[in-house]
């Protein structure tokens, strides 16, 4: 810790501190100085660790770019298989978000008459269910028939 400071220098600093601060304030000053030194060491170590981590990440990115530039031809079969599985998983995740060039629904109805009957049946089913929803919403259905009839 004190590489450049010898025993005589430490003794001189202690005596000067005792003379300047006195015996009452010297222990408090020593504690505060040691806490500052510890905080500085912790901060320096955390910065050092962060820099080392960033350098490792940069090295990994550089290694990946080198492997990619080589065409991944030197990889083992198991590693190539896992890369293919990862690519397929990425494609399956991206697939629902891709915009597909499909013909519009009107084009399907023109070329496929079966879909027209399905859509007509669906609209007739929704039309028959509409009066039921009106009677549920509030008024008595018998009063509607008297007013209509």
From Swiss-Prot:
Keyword Cell inner membrane: yes
UniProt KW Protein transport keyword: yes
UniProt region (Disordered), positions on chain: 86-149
GO cellular component: TAT protein transport complex
Record GO biological process: protein transport by the Tat complex
Membrane topology according to the record: Single-pass membrane protein
Quaternary data: The Tat system comprises two distinct complexes: a TatABC complex, containing multiple copies of TatA, TatB and TatC subunits, and a separate TatA complex, containing only TatA subunits. Substrates initially bind to the TatABC complex, which probably triggers association of the separate TatA complex to form the active translocon.
Protein name, entry field: Sec-independent protein translocase protein TatB
Gene: tatB
